[in-house]
């Protein structure tokens, strides 16, 4: 559990990661998986998109967090399209801008969109990208919880919620 990225880039070049860090992590993860039937979660903040194929190769099962406020992870539909079920996704709900500043309706839209993008075909644990801070209005936390509880069950049935939110944002943009 080491952060590999910042808001806009990696903390090291992909070549340095592949030469120095990846082999060590691969050995460690292979050893862990030889001892138990477990899923490995990699916690790394930041813009880690350039390393996701590498993380999959070293037996990472779940990326934590899907930090949608960083470069490369904003488009969760493209993320799921590219990596599909080779990776599980944990997070996706932004606590830097969305949760502190959005309306309840905007939070509902974001939650519905993330469930739709990352949850199709399974493999998604919906949650805030990080801790819920004191700057986040309680009604936005409740909106996240309520929508996740209502629509975050399989099989996903979000069509009505997404249609309602699309028309809401078309009228208020």
Question: How should each PLM-predicted stretch be described?
Answer:
Residues 1-173:
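Active-site loop segments of alpha/beta catalytic cores
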């Amino acid at each position: 559990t080491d952060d590999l990225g910042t808001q806009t880039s990696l903390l090291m070049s992909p070549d340095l990661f592949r030469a120095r860090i990846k082999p060590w992590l691969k050995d460690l993860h292979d050893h862990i998986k030889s001892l138990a039937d477990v899923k490995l979660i990699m916690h790394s903040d930041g813009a880690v998109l350039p390393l996701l194929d590498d993380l999959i190769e070293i037996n990472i099962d779940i990326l934590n967090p899907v930090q949608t406020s960083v470069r490369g992870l904003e488009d969760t539909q493209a993320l799921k399209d590219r990596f599909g079920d080779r990776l599980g996704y944990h997070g996706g709900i932004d606590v830097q801008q969305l949760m502190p500043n959005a309306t309840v309706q905007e939070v509902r839209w974001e939650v519905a969109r993330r469930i739709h993008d990352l949850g199709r075909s399974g493999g998604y644990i919906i949650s805030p990208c990080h801790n819920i801070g004191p700057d986040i209005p309680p009604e936005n936390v409740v909106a996240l919880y309520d929508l996740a509880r209502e629509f975050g069950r399989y099989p996903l049935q979000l069509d009505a919620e997404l249609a309602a939110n699309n028309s809401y944002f078309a009228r208020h943009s």
